[in-house]
């Protein structure tokens, strides 16, 4: 069964760290991390070594903050 994973982290190497929070509906926690590294790397042109993951947690559907993920969950 799919889980909702929230990843909090920061991107280093710029003038000041950029803090982010991402949420994913995935089967495994590793899938969420891989997707996050891929998205952040392509969107912000940073290598994985400059992405610092601060927290990875499983959350309930009620705790979802991402509007896109909320709409996706409502469809199912």
Swiss-Prot record:
SUPFAM superfamilies: RplX-like. Keywords: Ribonucleoprotein, Ribosomal protein, RNA-binding, rRNA-binding. GO terms for cellular component: ribonucleoprotein complex; ribosome. InterPro entries: Ribosomal_eL20, Ribosomal_eL20_dom. Signal peptide: none annotated. GO terms for molecular function: large ribosomal subunit rRNA binding; structural constituent of ribosome. It holds the Pfam family Ribosomal_L18A. One of its GO terms (biological process) is translation. HAMAP family: Ribosomal_eL20. Belongs to the eukaryotic ribosomal protein eL20 family. Part of the 50S ribosomal subunit. Binds 23S rRNA. This is Large ribosomal subunit protein eL20. The lineage of its organism: Archaea, Methanobacteriati, Methanobacteriota, Methanomada group, Methanococci. The gene is rpl18a.
